[in-house]
Each structure stands twice: as structure tokens, then as C-alpha cells.
């Protein structure tokens, strides 16, 4: 039974907190939390809920607002009293509500929240468990709640968290309707009385609450006034103070005459300090996403974007939409101008899309809301259907969220397509976020086709401009069945590559893919617009050819068959096979890879991975094919030499040298570059006419025991067969 104490006419009742609530308060008061600021968010959120309730009731019964039409939240710091007061004109609480809601009936979330806290959850999740009010004790030693409901008298609730609270009828200043929460702050929490700190917390957590939040501050300003004005001021001030105590009014008898007679004289002035109450609305940026997109200017979107992201630049593009029907939500999505430096740092929590439920902020890093490849998109999603107390675990299972995610991805792709029509801006977008689009092609099979339309590449015919795959297809020759591409390190490198010689000479366009992620992208993007994507660096490249060309190719195959066999014998396991090439024009040979193996570029990328899987490296790298150019004089002369004497040591040496050089020109790395270099140096010496034996005789100390013997040496040939 509550204790009853009689204070004159006032009846004060004391109640014990329900055990779980007492335990929760003890936990809040006695544990150190770094982000105490969330108490303000919780109290504002509660005020907003109370305002939502009265607004909802007034829809069916407008007279409910007779006790106060204005729906608002006021914040009043009082440094002299060390109190921070929050006032709302919401629905208020009856005496029974006050006793039940603030202490005697535990919410279902109380126990769950304590368990979560003890398991390491953040205190900021308190609101999700419906016990946000108690976060006031993070900063306050005593809390007083004065409340007035339309159906009851005005009551005051008070507690210093000692296991009990009191409730009494309140005969102080009438508040009309709503709730006033007065926090008596702890000595070390006075920062929440500072204008800067309150504004900072409201901006961070509550700037998009749907009701005006006004900060009331007592300020001083200097006022310059003439002496006679000073007298007037004094008179006015005394008039104002008359309510408090009767004071004689000062009259300036004859001041008018003095004024008139002294018009030409310079008036004496003095500065006085006057106190005034400054009112500032802290959330002027109303939830912009709830408004009609047609009524919002680009400047307003820009302001909202900057306040949301703290970016100093304007956004590049914006998509504002709402979805209605079985599911209702609104979203406002922005593309920034630049990619953040840590765009693909997985360990860093991204807070790009803020999730609201009916205008109340829920969380700012909701991974389930958007796929990773769109992690650069900034904005807000406001759902009407999700429950307010939703937790991260529930989000992962939520069907509603899956539908929202699907819609967001769809709208993002629409936004990119719209942006693609503006060449200048799309160029900026593509420079910043092309990796994301390519990652999307790798990961998102559903939207792969739409994403592929957004890709832009340099090609052998596009010059300095980048071109889309659609434009490439529109320029294809009638006989051309495939889209030809080459991957590599730079545009210059791939443009001068031996692989593109014949393709370009025949007038076919080649797409230049020069980013490491392109390799992953084309593994998934097998075709575009019904045309298969074919790498010019892999085996089986088929170029459209007429009967004459086919006949010539057959003749070359027969003519060079023996040389191919010999080269395969010499190179042994280094290559899978040696064939005649249909892709070379001016280069003597090149190394191609098998259709499903890695390209040279992919091999380079994989070797650079710090955490690579060596077992995969083995079988993906192994398949190399040497292709020789039948029209090249080096190859023709080598064929003649081999036919004259297939055991000629020079032939073996030249075959290995050709192979190693082809490895380099095809983008591979050598396993033993030193041996290759020594061979080249010998060739240079031969070219310069330097006698190897003379040099060795002059510098006996420099002779290394296992130095490579002269080019024609027997040993050298056998040694070269072992070297890759």
C-alpha cells in the first residue's frame, strides 16, 4: 500500500518501484556509460509519441485540442537551478498512467534490456525496449514529472531513484495539457545546460522529429541608449516589476521640454546590459522526406543532404520516392560527389542509410537495408509498417525489410540510369563509383543486366571518351558475333598488346578493361544483349573469316606442325600446347590461357593477394598455351633451322628465349628472371662482338662456378629446359 503523507492540503503518496525497474535504475546509475547524451533523444522521442497520440485522437474528436492547439516540444536549461526541463503539449498522463507507466508495472522490455545490457549491448538501445524514460538517470540525480491529461487533474511524479517515487496533485503553474520533465542534473553533467551541447545532441539524434523543438535560453545583450532613454527604460522596468512588489513609478517631469531644448546638443549615451529570453527552433529541417517532391527545391535537398552527412559539398543526384499499397514507406536517397576514402573497409561500420519508423529514428547502420555494393548511397528510409521497438535481430528476419531493400535497389538503379543521361555528371559518378557497379555485377545476379548497361569502358575506337556496351553493340560489324575485350593494367598497355593486333587490323572493336575488379566482373558477365563476351587473351578466339583465310590457316597449320611439336618437347610442362595463332600480326608469339583459367592480369592480381589460397593458385595458373605467328620472319627462320637439324642447340635456346619473352609481353611474370636476364646479356655481348672467353680470362675472380655456359653449349640447353 502506498504511504500517505499530508502536507497541508496536498496529499503525497509514496510508491515502491517494481523490482525489475529498481534493478534497471540501479544499473543505469551505477554503471559508467560514455554516451549519456542519448537521454535527450529518449525524452524527445517520448514527447513526440505523446504528441502523435493527441494528434491521432484529435482526428476523430477535434475538441481534444481545446486544451492547447499548438503541438510542440520546448527545452529550457536553467543554469542557476541546475535543471534541464522538457515540456511537450502531448496527450499527458492521468494519475493511474503516471503510477503504472513510471514505476509500478514493468514493461516487457525491462528484463530483456537488462539482459542485453549485461551481454554488452549499448545503452543507446534503451528506447527499443520501451524503457527510455529511465535514461534520464544517466545525467539526473532527481527527476520531477508534471503532467496533465484532458481526463484528469494535474499531477507531479518525483523520484531520486532510491527505490521509491512519490505522486501528488500539483497546484503549481497549470500546463494546460501535456508533460513537463524536470531533470535536476548531477554536478558533473552541467554540459547539458550549455547551448552548444544541447543543439549538438538534438541535431545528432532528433532533428527530424515531426514537431518543433524550441530551445529557450536566457541571454544578455548590450544596448546603447541615451541617458534619457535610460531613465525611460528604468521606468518601464519598474512598471514590469510592479507585479512582484509595489514600487513607486519614476516620472521624468519636464523631460519633453529638455528634449526639445537640447535637440541640437549631442546626446550622451551609455551601454547597458539587458537580459532577454532567446527562443530558437532546433529542428527547422522538418522531415523533408514526408513532403511532396514537387514542392522541394534543389537547395532544400542540398541543405538536408549536408545536415544528414556533414559533407561540405553538394550531392550529385537525389531520388525521393514513396511506396504505398500493402507496404508503406518513404525514402530519400543521395549519391555523393566523391567516394569516401574508406569505402570498401569492411571493418568500419557504415552509417549511410538512417532507418526511421513513423518519423522516429531507429538506427543509422542498418546493413539489411542495402546491399554492400551500394554502400555509398546516403539517405533515409521511413517505414510505416515496422514496429517501433524493432531490434537488429528482428530486422534480419523481417520480411518487410526485404521488400524495402528490393525497392531501394530498384530505385537506385533507376537513379543511375537517369544520371547516365547527363554525360558530365555521369562521368564524375563513374570515376567515383564504377567499382561498386562492377562489384554489383559480381554479387547481384538479379540486377546484373541492368547494372551492365551502366558500365563504361575505353575501347580501341572510343578515343579519350568511354563508351557503353550498348554503344559497342550498335557499332558491331554484321559478321561479328561476340564482344571482344582485353584485361590489363593500363589503357596504353592493352592497346599495344600483341593480343589485339589481328582483331584491330580486321576492324573489330576491342573493349579495354583496366581495373582489377573487371576480372571478377567478366567472370559473371558472360553476355550482353545476346552477344557473348570473349577475351582476346584466351584460347579459342574465333574471328569471322572467309574461305581464303580458312584455307591459308590450314596450310600454315600443316607447314608448322613439326615446329609446334618440337617447341612443345623443348618447353615440356611449361606449356599445355603450342599452336598456330590467328590473333598475331607483328609479334612472333604470345601466351594465351585456357578458357576457364586465369588471364595473365588475373594471375598478377591473385599473386598480390596477401591472404591468397595457394591450392587454387596451382590449378588456375597452370594452363598456358604458346601461340606462334606463321607470318613472322623469326618463326619462319626458326622452322627452317629446326627442319635442317632438330637437335640444333641454338634452336632449343631460342625457343626458351622466345617463350620467356612471350611470357613477359603477355603480362605474366618470370619465375627466374635472373637466368632470363643472363641470356639477354649474352645476346648483347654477341651483338657487340665481345668474346666471352677473353672476359673470363681477364677476370678470373669474377667467374662463378655455376655460371651459365655459352649459348651454344650442351649444358646450357639442358639447363634452360628446367627454367621457367
Swiss-Prot record:
In the resting state, through the dimerization of its C-terminal domain, HSP90 forms a homodimer which is defined as the open conformation. Upon ATP-binding, the N-terminal domain undergoes significant conformational changes and comes in contact to form an active closed conformation. After HSP90 finishes its chaperoning tasks of assisting the proper folding, stabilization and activation of client proteins under the active state, ATP molecule is hydrolyzed to ADP which then dissociates from HSP90 and directs the protein back to the resting state. Residues 9-231, 264-608 are annotated as: Interaction with NR3C1. CDD domains: HATPase_Hsp90-like (cd16927). It is found in: Cytoplasm; Melanosome; Nucleus; Secreted. Residues 222-270, 695-724 are annotated as: Disordered. GO terms for cellular component: aryl hydrocarbon receptor complex; cytoplasm; cytosol; dynein axonemal particle; extracellular region; melanosome; nucleus; perinuclear region of cytoplasm. PROSITE patterns: HSP90. Pfam families: HATPase_c_3, HSP90. This is Heat shock protein HSP 90-beta. It comes from Equus caballus.
